[in-house]
């Protein structure tokens, strides 16, 4: 049975592009939907090398070419993801409008291709921490893209948790072992928010992260 919120519909010659970080959620969506385009964006995040290593492994496993783009946004971020813990901003992860920027980059990258939708790896609960994890954000960005004739924005797993998404997709644990969620560098630190979430999910699935 398909879980609510996990879209599988596609028709005709339409193509889908997934913003792909090599993390658990985007990996599970990639494994399930096999979108035609997997877009990895190095926007200056300090974990880009680790994310890219994971993304390449997973793209190869599902027989998809990884499209790698670089856009320097580090000067606009602070906190662990930007490698700047000295900022006066007290939020550990502060990169204002980051997801809006990445979605816009995806729309720009594929403006000359018949891309029907851009997929993002938002899951249930993301909106409890960040406004860009809400259905309202997805709907608003979708309208904005549509104003310029762009593709639709979809969050196919926004109604399910990471664990529900994994169970429904039946992605192998071995593939999940390739995923990378650290915010602080090329190798998992084990203590940042990304690593803690990754480890919690893997432990619930019966395998240490």
Q: Which role fits each region the language model picked out?
A:
Residues 2-209:
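Nucleotide-activated chemistry modules centered on ATP-dependent adenylation/adenylyltransferase
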């Amino acid at each position: 049975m398909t879980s609510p919120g996990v879209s599988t519909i596609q028709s005709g010659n339409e193509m889908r592009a997934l913003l792909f970080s090599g993390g658990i959620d985007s990996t599970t969506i990639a494994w399930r939907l096999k979108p035609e385009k997997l877009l990895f964006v190095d926007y200056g995040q300090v974990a880009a090398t680790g994310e890219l290593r994971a993304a390449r492994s997973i793209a190869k496993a599902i027989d998809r070419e990884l499209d790698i783009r670089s856009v320097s946004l580090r000067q606009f971020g602070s906190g662990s993801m930007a490698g700047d813990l000295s900022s006066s901003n007290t939020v550990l992860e502060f990169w204002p409008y980051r997801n809006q920027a990445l979605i816009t980059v995806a729309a720009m990258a594929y403006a000359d291709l018949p891309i029907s939708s851009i997929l993002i790896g938002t899951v249930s609960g993301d909106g409890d921490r960040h406004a860009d994890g809400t259905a309202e954000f997805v709907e608003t960005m979708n309208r904005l893209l549509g104003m310029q004739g762009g593709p639709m924005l979809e969050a196919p797993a926004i109604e399910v948790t990471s664990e529900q998404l994994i169970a429904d997709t039946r992605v192998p644990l071995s593939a999940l072992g390739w995923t990378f969620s650290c915010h602080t560098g090329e190798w998992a630190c084990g203590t940042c928010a990304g690593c803690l979430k990754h480890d919690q999910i893997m432990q619930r699935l019966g395998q240490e992260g």
